[in-house]
Amino acid sequence: MMSQSPRNFSRRDLFRGLVARGKAAYHEVDDQPQRTIPRPPGALAEATFRRLCDGCGLCVEACPSSVIQLTGQWPELCLDYNHCQLCTQCAQVCPTGALLPATKTELLPTFAYQCHNRLLGYCELCIEQCPTQAIQCEPNQQPVVNEDLCNGCGECRPICPANAIEWQFRKSTEK
């Protein structure tokens, strides 16, 4: 029979163990599935969202801008032809809690090569349309988006005559 004597830990052992646990926790969070499909504003982290959302479509019906579409089982945010009003009606009708009220979407505009301001030096329609004044540019330059000001509403995209605005996910989209 083995004796049950207390094991002595040095301070170094304690910190080594804490660092190892911290690294393990970091890698667990890092292994969460990354979002590849834009969800309605306030969508929880993708894995949680998919677990909670029952695909009822109430958010689609509640959206006054018709920018939420049910694709397969889950809702997607589509800002191709209209913008999100960020009215939170989708979150208010969500019976499962998969959507929370939000003041931003998870998307940011990016500007493609064919941007008229960059090529021709005269177009500022996206700047004029932006309700938060998040887009700025110099003549003959590609517009730049201030990520802190941009709410991802999409008002800039439908107005673009060159169809030069595309979407990227914010760096930290998971909640």
Predicted regions and their residues:
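Non-ligating segments of multi-cofactor redox enzymes
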Residues: 1-175
